[in-house]
Amino acid sequence: MIICGFPGTGKSMMAKFSRWVDLESTPFKKNWLLYAEVAKHMSDNGYNVMISTHKEVLDALEQIEASYTVVIPPITDKATYLHRYDMRGNTYDFIRLLDENWERWINAIVEKPTALKTIVVLPKDGCVKAFADEFGKENR
């Protein structure tokens, strides 16, 4: 199972306390196709994988025909998430980037229909853990 989690939805925390893998994108140095291929390979081999929601990552998953679920916060929960980014120590530039692009990025995910993608909108103040546990059970 591949879950693409919007920033702040709890990917890293989930991986610390469960059998999910948080596949960090940084080592791939923007080689999004390789990142998607590694996630798909891990998923095909029984791992539950969480990755980022960068547009290029979602496009790469489509390119390799990998099924995936995107977990996003409610678009109205922006202030909660900006506070969450601050509390977890993200940089001012990161927080500003999310603040300036919040609506555009979430809308881009929702407005691009595809047969390979399932979208889950978290409840207010929610995190990916509750949904990831259920997704993982379905794919064992």
Predicted regions and their residues:
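Short His-Asn-centered micro-motif
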Residues: 3-6, 23-25, 49-54, 72-74
